[in-house]
């Protein structure tokens, strides 16, 4: 189930913590010719005995003229170490971007080391937040200052 693979990655991702996309989004992607799915499976003999044979990785990519954008990835983590399914799905994305003649491939913001090995360049990440009520932030800041003062006056951690 491709949606289950997506949710595996989504559940473990804390760099960008968002809500789960509804199943309908994936259905809509499937109807739009600008969206592509790359599905990675193993040869039959590679599946462990008793394990259901199915996709071990998927990527949902968007083709916008000269730009290829892998937007979402899904993984079966049981195959991450043994078959390096994340590395393989990234390589398949690079191959597909070349096949469609994409001039630019936007890989996303996580797993920088793996993507650099495929020739990606990392750019600094910046985010801005507008806070309507800063009470909690100010409280945390006061706690940090108090903790720092305790360390400085005692000569060690509080």
Short names for language-model regions:
Residues 65-129:
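Acyl-donor binding region in acyl/amide transferases
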Residues 8, 17, 28-30, 85, ...:
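Detector for Asparagine
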Residues 1-9, 24, 91, 95, ...:
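Long hydrophobic alpha-helices with heptad-repeat/coiled-coil character
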Residues 24, 36, 44-46, 52, ...:
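Glutamate identity and glutamate-enriched acidic tracts
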Residues 1-81:
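A conserved beta-strand-loop-helix scaffold within acyl/acetyltransferase catalytic domains
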Residues 109-158:
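Terminal substrate-recognition subdomain of acyl/acetyltransferases
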Residues 18, 41, 95, 104, ...:
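Residue-identity detector for threonine
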